[in-house]
Structure formats: C-alpha cells, structure tokens
Amino acid sequence: SVSGVASKYAIANEYDKMMTAMGAQGTNAFTSFEKTVYTDDVPANALNKYITVQAERFRNPVLRIFHTELEAVYEEKNRSLDSDNSEVFETLFASLFKKHNYGLQTTIGTVEHLKNPSLKEIRKYFHTYYVPNNMAVVLSGDFNPDEAIAEIDKAFSYMTPKAVPQYTFEKEEPITAP
C-alpha cells in the first residue's frame, strides 16, 4: 500500500522535534466548520526560522506520515461515536441545518470517508483552498510587527492568489415550532 511505502520514509515526530528544537511549545491543529488552524507558541528569537518552516510546509506538503495522521483522526471519529455530547451536537446541527453542510456532514466526515481517503482529492483540496487570499497569519507577542510582516511577505511570496469556489447552499426553511 502507499501508506506502507510512505511509512518507510517517515521520520517519527519530525515536525514536533523541529518545533521543539527552536523552543516552540503547544504545537497543535484543529479543524472546525469554516477553518483549519495550526498553533504554536514560539519564542520571539525563533520567529524568522518558524516563518520559514511554515512557508515551506505550505509550499509542497509532504504527506509521508499521512497514514499515521489518518489513524489519529480515525480514533477521534471513533471516540465521537461513543460520546453523548457529540451525538447531541450532531443531532442539533442536523436538525437546524437540513440543507447545509453544517448539518449534512460532520467536520471530521464519516467512517466511510476515513476508510477510503484519496490523496489525489486531498491534494486537489489543498491547491484549491490553501491559497493566500484564503489564509491568515495571526501573531501576538514580543516582536517587531513590521519586521515580522516583512519576513512573512518574503517567505510566502511564492504563493499566488486565485479564485476560491464560493460555497452555495439552499436557504433553510424557517423554524416555526420547537
């Protein structure tokens, strides 16, 4: 399998080790309805190095550890299947948004989606939506903002804006009763 071949080249915890080496903490990511967020707490003296790493990550993602990430997502999905809170949340959104993706599918997808992921479709999604006019960089802390913006502009200058497909959906019927 592709995952089996890729695992031969995977470097365990490569990204986390790189972040730790520059003093970063709190490395994490999450996806919600309208966004995917990557977070790190980075020392100000490592900001330029961090920006360079992030720019390279988005230039041409290496998906050699995709199989292990998928396993983590699959586990998260399995936990949600056993969670009353998740069931209430999904039922609520399915009831409120009968014609919108908020109610038609969960952010994480279905078990079937996770069983048969297409790297081709993942790359297509990445190249469609991970474009500069659909992204934001948010920084806070003890650094010179003008220097940081200049460094971000330089590091991400290879990216070119392009049209992002507009999501369209049918108007929901008014809720007239509890």
Predicted regions and their residues:
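Soluble periplasmic/extracytoplasmic beta-strand elements of cell-envelope proteins
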Residues: 37-41, 50, 136-142
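Non-catalytic beta-strand/loop surface segments
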Residues: 4-45, 80-134, 158-178
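Acidic/histidine-enriched alpha-helical segments
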Residues: 62-78, 144, 163-177
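Active-site recognition of the HExxH zinc-binding catalytic motif
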Residues: 1
